[in-house]
């Protein structure tokens, strides 16, 4: 039996996704051996243990936003937020715990938001929705945006983002694998290991934000890797008024 399945069967995690993430984060042991592959075959489930801090949020993404808010000293109390690329809700989870007043959660997918967040009255969920085409009435009072998009460059949404009338802060997850272009991404097989390429993608994103009237106040490497081990970055932008 796979160890991620065994973890769920033992009641240690509520889903295979969370179990697999814990394995990748090095929190799961089989006997005295640390296991890092969710596909690891288990013969005796009784030898499985979870050590260290268990994931405090509904997804690993929460650790990324937590790090950004702490690094950039951003207070979420009473803020009205839009979470672009909300997915399971890791960013939403962090924001709620830090006193956000309201969240517009937007994602092109469906049925991804964690069950513990889906019915939260502070979350206004817009699934199967492309942020670029969301109605202006939905985002009129938004003052902070968090961004975690995949398979497109974040620069593609800036024309819409800049139109939000009350927007001030933006916390953006920069993913070099989606910013470098399809040719480079294919050359590196989706994992950008070249530091120069990563640096250039960050520069390109900062320049694009600047061209749309945003100041970059800080950039920090994500505390955890993204999919397939990609190094990612978090940036804080402030809209000029």
Regions picked out by a protein language model, each given a short descriptive name:
Residues 94-102, 167-168:
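Conserved S-adenosyl-L-methionine
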Residues 166-180:
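Conserved beta-strand signature within the Rossmann-like core of class I S-adenosyl-L-methionine
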Residues 152-166:
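A short, conserved alpha-helix within the catalytic core of class I
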Residues 176-193:
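Short, glycine-/aromatic-enriched active-site segment of Class I SAM-dependent methyltransferases
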Residues 77-87:
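Conserved class I S-adenosyl-L-methionine
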Residues 1-46:
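A basic, amphipathic helix-loop patch mediating RNA/tRNA/ribosome contacts
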Residues 87-92, 109:
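Residues at the N-terminus of the alpha-helix immediately C-terminal to the conserved SAM/SAH-binding loop
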Residues 104-156:
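S-adenosyl-L-methionine
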């Amino acid at each position: 039996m796979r160890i991620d399945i065994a973890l769920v069967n033992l009641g240690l995690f509520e889903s295979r996704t969370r179990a697999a993430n814990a394995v990748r984060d090095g929190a799961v042991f089989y006997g005295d051996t640390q296991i890092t592959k969710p596909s690891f075959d288990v013969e005796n489930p009784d030898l499985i243990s979870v050590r260290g801090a268990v994931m405090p949020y509904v997804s690993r993404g929460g650790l990324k936003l937590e790090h950004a808010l702490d690094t950039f000293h951003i207070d979420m109390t009473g803020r009205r937020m839009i979470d672009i690329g909300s997915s399971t809700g890791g960013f939403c989870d962090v924001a709620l715990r830090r006193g956000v007043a309201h969240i517009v959660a937007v994602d092109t997918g469906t049925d991804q938001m964690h069950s513990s967040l889906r019915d939260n009255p502070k979350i206004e969920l817009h699934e199967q929705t492309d942020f670029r085409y969301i109605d202006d009435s939905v985002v009129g009072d938004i003052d902070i945006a968090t961004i975690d998009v995949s398979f497109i460059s974040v620069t593609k949404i800036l024309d819409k983002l800049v139109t939000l009338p009350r927007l001030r802060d933006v916390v953006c997850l920069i993913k070099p694998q989606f910013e470098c272009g399809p040719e480079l991404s294919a050359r590196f097989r989706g994992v950008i290991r070249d530091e120069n390429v990563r640096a250039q993608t960050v520069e390109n994103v900062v320049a694009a934000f600047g061209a749309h009237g945003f100041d970059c106040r800080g950039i920090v490497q994500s505390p955890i890797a993204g999919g397939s081990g990609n190094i990612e970055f978090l940036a804080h932008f402030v809209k000029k008024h």
